[in-house]
């Protein structure tokens, strides 16, 4: 009887853990749905046509090491930047990027821009590393 009770409790605990994991996954996918992702080539084309403004969410060390997209707005900090650092026109297309696909700073900053009322916000998940790998021009700092 104790064995059955123990197995039942372990099963319930495992079920509870799987549900909380599923909620976490749903929450993170909601962020991804709010902030569309774009490719390096899409960004290159849109920047050339002046359709979007690039926004760099990297720290100074990454900027000095890898450079920045030409003409990018350089945020003071991806988590604590002021909306006044972004273009005044909240309908202007903004594309946020950070170091690479393992960096979450661009998503954090893009979410903050959405909260501040910007309507056309995107993220380039490949970041500056993907930009450089694709042979695109960078501005050195």
Regions found by a protein language model. Name each.
Residues 41-50:
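A short acidic-Thr-Gly-centered motif at the start of a beta-strand
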Residues 2, 6, 15-40, 61-96, ...:
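Rhodanese-like catalytic fold shared by cysteine-dependent sulfurtransferases
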């Amino acid at each position: 009887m104790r064995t059955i009770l123990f197995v039942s409790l372990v099963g319930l605990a495992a079920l509870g853990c799987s549900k909380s994991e599923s909620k976490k996954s749903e929450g993170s996918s909601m962020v991804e749905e709010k902030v569309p992702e774009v490719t390096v080539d899409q960004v290159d084309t849109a920047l050339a046509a002046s359709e979007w403004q690039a926004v760099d969410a990297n720290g100074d060390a990454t900027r000095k090491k890898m450079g920045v997209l030409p003409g990018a707005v350089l945020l003071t900090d991806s988590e604590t930047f002021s909306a006044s650092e972004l273009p005044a026109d909240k309908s202007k297309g903004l594309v946020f990027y950070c170091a690479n696909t393992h960096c979450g700073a661009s998503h954090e900053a893009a979410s903050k821009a959405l909260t501040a009322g910007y309507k056309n916000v995107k993220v380039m998940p490949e970041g500056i590393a993907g930009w450089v790998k694709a042979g695109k021009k960078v501005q050195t700092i």
